[in-house]
Design a protein with these regions (language model features):
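Cellulosome-associated attachment modules in secreted, modular CAZymes
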Residues: 444-510
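Bacterial N-terminal signal peptides that target proteins for export
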Residues: 1-9
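Hydrophobic alpha-helical membrane-insertion segments
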Residues: 40, 166, 204, 337, ...
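Cleavable N-terminal signal peptides
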Residues: 9-11, 21
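Feature for long, exposed domains in two main contexts
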Residues: 337-448
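Acidic glycine-/aspartate-rich tracts in secreted/extracellular proteins
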Residues: 33, 69-70, 82-83, 112-113, ...
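Divalent cation-coordinating acidic motifs and surrounding scaffolds
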Residues: 23-339, 439-441, 446
Length: 510
């Protein structure tokens, strides 16, 4: 992983503490505890999802869920997402498959996310297999089509318990998920949003997910750099997610990311990759990752309601009520969407005299959709320029922020030889939809004009008595073209211009 500090705009947003997802792409994870359909908990879910406290709200763009009991449960939860006060009402659900136990679900905002499809990665069953199905949901942000703008989101609800059999079944599930991630199409990003039921980062299943191996293509990373023995440890009280209705003492619910979402290029986690999550405050300005509702004051108790500093009493109580007596807090993180490159497709130098300077300007723009994502929600464009033979472009790596500006680059064309010229300027960038953008460059180089050939004739001999007559006529009429020596003295035309013309005539034309 490459260490990278947040941009100033993102840092300001983070300092506000889990602000609504008005710009970035917010991904949420929530085990909804045996949800089978419309019922007494629905009002609590709606409040937890869209109520606001001090400008903060959950308001995800993508929600990965576990412990759905049926298609009716998915349909009812979708209705909660669309009917909650403050909801944009643009939610849809991915396909539901009814496995052997409780099941996964995937919800997304259609104005911001393109859903590509669902894959049943592995079917759950009894021991020694993992107990529940593993699902993968593939999507992209609206306005993108490239592989590097695609995310495969895995949903998993691993085996609970700490017997040898429990741990072996979790390890098997981790192995299956990592192997599937390693087989994804080239350039894809991936994440795991799951109820891991893992009490410590030292357990084999977690090591399998995040540890280095000979093949690291399917490796996951904890974006908040918080390994440890999470269970019943006060040191991790700000990241505990279970159980808001009983005792907050486990970090079972997590979102893990691929290296490609943590490299500072294109699709990217909004947060610092060099600083672990705070152990002294829930409102960590270095991370967008949050355990929604956990202000760190609930260790070994049910979730704090009165004076809850993160979400206030109304949302805190809703999170408890949604847990159904034994449940989980949602977690979320924010992603910055990739840049999009734009430039002219053609640069025409026109007609240029031989050996004259020929320059033109190439403008490169970050065309990310700021109306949809805002400036803070789009990554900077990073690119280099490469010119074909006969043309030159500036070297080095360039950066262009979103928001309507552009970088201007001087492109030069060689004029050493006569004739039509053509070539390309290649923009190599981290724009996922067009990583290689080719700009055509054309021009025409002609012989320099010969001053002594006053009448512009092309017959042989080019210079003859007609050129003397032409020059005399220009001089007599006061035409500025007779100012052969380029003088500015008064009179501008004088005997020196005759001498200048005779010298040019004696030199001849090439």
């Amino acid at each position: 992983m490459h260490a990278r500090l947040c941009s100033l705009a993102a840092a300001v947003a983070l300092a506000a503490g889990a602000a609504p997802s008005l710009a970035q792409l917010r991904v949420g994870e929530w085990n909804v505890t045996n949800y089978g359909g419309a019922g007494a908990r629905d009002a609590a879910f709606r409040t937890a999802l869209y109520a606001s406290f001090n400008g903060r709200q959950f308001a995800p763009d993508v929600l990965v869920g576990q412990e759905f009991l049926s298609q009716a449960g998915v349909t009812a939860f979708l209705a909660n997402l669309n009917s909650a006060a403050g909801s944009p009402g643009d939610w849809a659900a991915g396909p539901f498959n009814n496995g052997a136990d409780t099941d996964n679900a995937f919800f997304f905002r259609t104005s911001r996310v393109q859903f590509l499809g669902m894959t049943i990665v592995s079917v759950g069953s009894g021991s020694p297999n993992h107990p529940r199905d593993i699902n993968r949901y593939d999507f992209r942000p609206v306005g993108y089509s490239g592989a590097a703008a695609t995310i495969a989101a895995y949903s998993s609800h691993m085996k609970a318990g700490n017997t040898a059999d429990d741990q072996a079944r979790r390890l098997l599930e981790a192995q299956i998920i990592r192997a599937n991630a390693a087989s994804l199409p080239s350039g894809w990003n991936f994440l795991l949003a799951a109820d891991l039921n893992i009490p410590s980062s030292a357990q084999s299943a977690y090591v399998e997910l995040v540890g280095p191996q000979a093949n690291n293509a399917g490796r996951f990373f904890d974006p908040i750099l918080t390994p440890g023995s999470w269970n019943n440890s006060n040191a991790f009280r700000f990241v505990h997610t279970q159980d808001p209705a009983v005792t907050m003492d486990d970090r079972f619910d997590q979102i893990l990311l691929s290296a490609s979402l943590l490299d500072g290029l294109a699709f990217d986690y909004i947060g610092s990759l060099s600083i672990p999550y705070s152990t002294t405050t829930w409102n960590d300005p270095n991370h967008s990752y949050r355990a929604w509702g956990n202000d760190g004051s609930s260790f070994n108790n049910l979730l704090t309601v009165a004076n809850n500093q993160m979400v206030g009493p109304t949302i805190a109580q809703a999170l408890i009520d949604a847990a159904n007596g034994l449940g989980h807090l949602p977690v979320f993180l924010d992603l910055r969407v990739p840049a999009q490159v734009a430039s002219p497709t053609l640069i025409d130098f026109g007609t240029v005299s031989q050996n004259a300077t020929a320059q033109a300007t190439l403008t490169v723009t970050n065309a990310g959709n700021t109306t949809l994502w805002t400036v803070a929600g789009i990554a900077n464009l990073r690119y280099t320029l490469a010119a074909s033979a006969g043309f030159t472009a500036p070297g080095g790596t360039f950066t262009e922020a979103p928001g309507g500006g552009s970088n201007a680059h001087t492109i030069s064309m060689s004029t050493a030889s006569i004739g039509p010229k053509s070539g390309t300027i290649t923009i190599n960038s981290d724009s996922p939809d067009e990583p290689v953008r080719v700009v055509m460059v054309v021009g025409n180089v002609v012989a320099a004009a010969c001053y002594a050939n006053c009448d512009g004739s092309t017959t042989i001999p080019i210079l003859n008595v007609n050129d003397f007559s032409c020059f005399l006529n220009l001089f007599a009429s006061g035409d500025p073209r007779a100012n052969c020596d380029g003088s500015t003295e008064i009179p501008v035309l004088n005997i020196n211009d005759f001498g200048c013309f005779l010298n040019a005539y004696s030199v001849g034309c090439p």
